[in-house]
UniProtKB/Swiss-Prot annotation:
Keyword tRNA-binding in annotation: no
Keywords of the record: Cell inner membrane, Cell membrane, Membrane, Transferase, Transmembrane, Transmembrane helix
Positions of transmembrane segments: 1-21, 26-46, 77-97, 108-128
Name of this protein: Phosphoglycerol transferase I
Cellular component per GO, a single term: plasma membrane
GO molecular function, one term: phosphatidylglycerol-membrane-oligosaccharide glycerophosphotransferase activity
Similarity comment: family membership: Belongs to the OpgB family.
Source organism (scientific name): Salmonella agona (strain SL483)
Reactions listed under catalytic activity: a phosphatidylglycerol + a membrane-derived-oligosaccharide D-glucose = a 1,2-diacyl-sn-glycerol + a membrane-derived-oligosaccharide 6-(glycerophospho)-D-glucose
Function of the molecule: Transfers a phosphoglycerol residue from phosphatidylglycerol to the membrane-bound nascent glucan backbones.
Cellular localisation: Cell inner membrane
Length: 763
């Protein structure tokens, strides 16, 4: 309703100003500004919906205050360009319409009415309401009801008798199981759902709307609110250290806790969270690649669901035979947005909707078949009678190719339970949320019926029942939940552990690299993750007088304040203010002790602007002084004009990537010498090994042969045509996720370059 009202007010404002207000520069500027704000808000809402499927939420607020550079958003570049172009077009059209009758006399009354209507349209817009509520949640000091409803469970289950299998289905919300809306989409898993305790109204709350957040909510009974973006949790060394979560209780009760997934465990700090709360046995992409039958059978995120669930079954079988009490948690990935992935073993590889194939629905149909097969193996085993099986979505589906069809339905998360000891077939329509999942499981296992803010849906009352405005209530509790992290409020002395890549201060530990914003009685950690901006881009958003401590590889800060360290991959510590003084210190000991020393100096805005501009230089445009191209640092030597076909720096060097160019091309500013040696230190990937690799300069071509290990080869070139471009053409680029950033499309790797040096041998 508010959406229609805001649009009506917007149109009324435009029409009244365009046809009645007449000409006045001030009123025109004011009205255009407010109407433009309305447009920006609604385009932001649309764009946010595209990424999150949930409007302008906590993750969007974080992104709006941090650079997107370096984030894994390649699949969304075209939509982003489209939104930007639409914004320019709408602004241009709006300005043209408002100035249609600019030659008519000015009328104050109509101008004022148009401005008031424009303000009303902004106030009534859902986007403005969502942003207002989020900003309020950042500024609140907490909610008195938090202390009333937050409850710590007992640390043990008195007499545990049942093993637990807990399956998180990636984005596998209950809406997919509506057979009227999506006929025959989930027949196998849907049939199992109908055999058990099916909770039909599991809503999604703020702070529970992405994978790690859904896991925290379901095991600890709290939303994932933190003083940093949730998917950057990999940088912390402990996760809600004061909380008692389901895994802690299980471990204290004699359970061996296992977790199996196909993606890298470190993404979003899943490994940190699970290790912090009772899980001693973790298996992700790195751990599974040495045990699975086909290590190359992977999608953009990791191993396919059929592979993961096959390994989970092997674990279940072995643990059941051992006779020890255990829990086995697993997380699928094939239904990840925006398209999903189809495993090769499922029968349901295609699902048509509206008369055409839909990739997301197809992925859902395939994945549910794999999950059902895993469950049926357990049910057919002699150990099912001692087992509780839980199936839940980690969160609602984000904007995938099925999202617009899902939004036409009443959307809820999936949560159902199959009890081997006591079969129960019932659909429970009680209002609940993801935070209630762990408490419900704990209740069935014989423990308490509460964890944190979660309550058992079998014997307790969910916050979703207590509060009609439960979403707003949870946001009001955000400061209380952030305080559970027990983050330090000051930093004076700190220790950098060079070998463990950690920093410790005020009793807390963080993984490196790390950026800290330091103010009175507050230290704000800004970690770096696959989906957050590089730290230098985050630092560029600091105000001129903001105090910072930045711990990162030396070469990343050297271009600003320490040119002598431009090629160093050691750790360095920089601190100061962007508009004042900065220092850079080289970490030259295994245990390096540091102190903060912020000086209250005069702020120089020219210096500030220069620092910000330098911080924002993209990697490929960085230049350093060196007599060779060093590939494990960003940028290139000063002599290089541009280069292409080369992937990002890694600790050892860089791969060629045919996705970025069929050949490696390095163009120098000046012609290469008439006669020179080309010294190449490199290795080959896959089928490129032990094959001739053409290397060209002008009209002359040499061949390079590399093995899988790094070696140094010298090629002799004549350059009579004064060519300035070096070209290397790997013969068989291999499409692979090896070393890839999680969630990104595969790279096409050819050779791995460590160093290339041009040695002049003229005369």
């Amino acid at each position: 309703m508010s959406e229609l009202l805001s649009v009506a007010l917007f149109l009324a404002s435009v029409l009244i100003y365009a046809w009645k207000a007449g000409r006045n520069t001030w009123w025109f500027a004011a009205t255009l500004t407010v109407l433009g704000l309305f447009v920006i808000l609604n385009i932001t809402l649309y764009a946010s919906d595209y990424f999150t499927g949930d409007g302008i939420n906590d993750a969007v607020l974080y992104t709006l205050t941090n650079s997107l550079t370096g984030a894994g958003v390649g699949k969304y570049i075209l939509p982003g360009i489209g939104i930007a172009l639409a914004l320019v077009a709408v602004f241009g059209a709006l300005g043209w319409i408002l100035r249609r009758r600019r030659h008519h006399p000015h009328h104050v009354g109509y101008s004022l009415l148009a401005l008031l209507l424009a303000l009303g349209s902004v106030d009534a817009s859902p986007a403005f309401r969502q942003i207002t509520e989020l900003v309020k949640s950042q500024m609140r000091d907490g909610d008195p009801d938090f202390a009333v409803y937050y409850k710590e469970p007992a640390k043990t289950i008195p007499h545990p008798k049942l093993n637990l299998v807990y399956i998180y289905g990636e984005s596998l919300e209950r809406t997919y199981f509506d057979n009227d809306a999506f006929p025959n989409l989930t027949p196998e898993l849907g049939a199992l759902k109908n055999e058990g305790l099916d909770f039909s109204h599991t809503m999604q709350l703020p702070g529970t709307d992405y994978t790690i957040a859904g896991m925290v909510a379901s095991q600890c009974g709290i939303p994932l609110f933190a003083p940093f973006e949730g998917n950057a949790s990999a940088s912390v060394s402990s996760f809600f250290p004061q909380n008692i979560c389901l895994g802690d209780i299980l471990k204290n009760s004699g359970y061996q806790n296992y977790f199996v997934q196909g993606a890298n465990l470190r993404f979003a700090g899943k490994d940190v969270f699970l290790k912090s709360h009772g899980f001693d046995h973790l298996y992700g992409a790195e751990e599974l690649k040495t045990v699975v039958a086909d290590p190359s059978y992977r999608n953009d995120w990791g191993f396919y669901d059929d592979t993961v669930l096959d390994e989970a079954w092997k674990k279940f079988e072995a643990l059941s035979r051992s006779g020890q009490r255990f829990s086995l948690f697993t997380l699928t990935v094939d239904t990840h947005h925006p398209d999903g992935f189809i495993s090769r073993t499922c029968n349901r590889k295609r699902y048509d909707y509206d008369g055409k194939p839909n990739q997301s629905f197809s992925a859902v149909s395939c994945s549910q078949e794999n999950i059902a097969e895993f469950i049926n193996k357990i049910k057919a085993s002699p150990w099912f009678k001692d087992t509780v099986i839980v199936v839940s979505s980690d969160h609602l589906a984000m904007n995938n190719t099925a999202w617009k069809y899902l939004n036409k339905q009443d959307r809820n998360n999936l949560f159902f339970i199959l009890r081997g000891d006591k079969p129960q077939q019932e659909t429970l329509a009680v209002k609940r949320n993801t935070m209630d999942n762990g408490a419900t499981v704990l209740d069935i296992l014989g423990g308490d019926n509460f964890i944190g803010l979660g309550r058992s849906s079998l014997s307790g009352q969910s916050l979703s029942e207590v509060f009609l405005n439960v979403k707003e209530k949870v946001l009001a509790m955000k400061p209380d939940i952030i305080r559970l992290w027990n983050f330090p409020k000051e930093i004076k002395d700190f220790t950098v552990d060079r070998d463990k890549n950690m920093i410790a201060f005020s009793g807390s530990h963080f993984r490196l690299p790390l950026l800290l914003r330091v103010s009175d009685k507050r230290v704000e950690p800004l970690p770096e993750s696959e989906y957050s901006a590089p730290l230098r881009f985050q630092l560029a958003d600091f105000a001129p007088r903001d105090n910072f401590v930045w711990i990162d590889r030396c070469y990343k800060m050297a271009q600003l304040w320490a040119p002598a360290l431009a090629l160093s991959t050691d750790w360095c510590v920089s601190q100061g203010q962007l508009g004042g003084q900065q220092t850079v210190q080289h970490v030259d000991k295994a245990q390096w002790q540091g102190k903060t020393a912020f000086k209250d100096t005069m702020i120089d805005m020219e210096r500030y602007k220069g620092n910000v501009d330098t911080l924002k230089i993209v990697d490929n445009d960085i230049r350093y002084k060196a007599d060779s191209f060093i590939f494990n640092v960003a940028g290139a030597p000063e002599e290089v004009k541009q280069f292409s076909g080369i992937s990002r720096p890694e600790s050892w060097g860089r791969w060629s990537n045919a996705q970025l160019g069929d050949e490696v091309k390095i163009e120098y500013k000046a012609p290469l010498p008439k006669k020179f040696d080309l010294v190449i230190t490199a290795k080959a990937f896959g089928d490129n090994a032990n094959r001739p690799i053409p290397v060209r300069v002008g009209n002359e071509e040499q061949t390079l042969v590399l093995g899988h290990d790094v070696s140094t080869i010298t090629l002799h070139f004549n350059n009579p045509t004064d060519a300035n471009t070096l070209v290397i053409a790997p013969p068989a680029p291999v499409s692979t996720n090896e070393g890839n950033i999680l969630g990104h499309s595969p790279r096409k790797l050819g050779i791995g370059m460590v160093e290339i040096k041009v040695v002049n041998v003229e005369g």
